[in-house]
Amino acid sequence: MKTPLLGMTLAELKEVARSLGMPAFTGGQIAKWIYGSHVRDIAEMTNISKANREKLAEQYCIGVMENIDAQHSVDGTIKYLFPVASGKFVETVFIPDKDRATLCVSCQVGCKMNCLFCQTGKQGFEGSLTAADILNQIYSLPEAERLTNIVFMGQGEPMDNLDNVLRATEVLTAEWGYAWSPKRITVSSVGVRNKLKRFLDESECHVAISLHSPIPEQRATLMPAQKGMGIEEVVELLRQYDFSHQRRLSFEYIVFDGLNDSMTHARAIVNLLKGLDCRINLIRFHQIPDAPLKTSDEKKMEVLRDYLTQHGIFTTIRASRGQDIFAACGLLSTKKIYERIK
């Protein structure tokens, strides 16, 4: 089994070169071919001698794994199915818009968080992705050249696979890598003790926190992770960081009918986030099997948006994309696909 070069840092690629008796600068050449030119085969690295390319190819490969399925929505959204190193599969969603194109990537197969409203959690946890698995979703995307933004909002909890998420974002933002600005990348989280702080310290990417209720007891019924790191503790941690400049903080809030769409909730949100430089994205609930929840109506969402905005929190209602292909928020799951392919 050959080792993928995709996902390796510049230091690691230099070490690969040294271990094979090549000059250290060859590692830099490899990095440019992979992250700059996006080659599919080591043989394409033409400024490396043929002998060294052959030596490299004996033990290593680029690590490209093409998608095995693509579903197209009427709104232009495309959901791809990618294989990962473990033999499982993840879904990745390409969301084109007028002046931007966003890719929603997965970081785990399934998820441990088991949020009441999310189909991925119903799948259970089947393993974390490697950095190569994460980056392959971008590297092998047919529309990769069109991308303007990446969001870690697909399957899995990024803080539960933090080493590989940080490695992937390092490759994406480093000068020797994709050289993207960190402000083109948003990483979401329910809030995981210790891991969230490490992410905030080691990354400059935007952060999105799953809020869904400002009332701790209610949030715990929606999100078991509340019992591990409560939303008050999450907000207290966030207050230690500066989000007034390049880095952006947002809160995701799925609006459920009769559950979290009242003015009581609106006032509690304002009180919870008072003085914090942030924005809120209100999200429509997309029905999943056996979830005793309904989406709030448009008018209530507009009232909630207007109240929060009037009280100093910039708030938007997120447009639902890809709902007809089960690519919208909370609908990603590969369990049935895996069982069918297996």
Regions inferred by a protein language model and the residue ranges of each:
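Ferredoxin-type iron-sulfur electron-transfer modules in oxidoreductases and energy-metabolism complexes
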Residues: A132, N136-A144
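P-loop NTP-binding catalytic core
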Residues: S86-I95, D99-R100
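Short linear Ser/Thr-Pro motifs
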Residues: S73, S106-C107, S188, S210
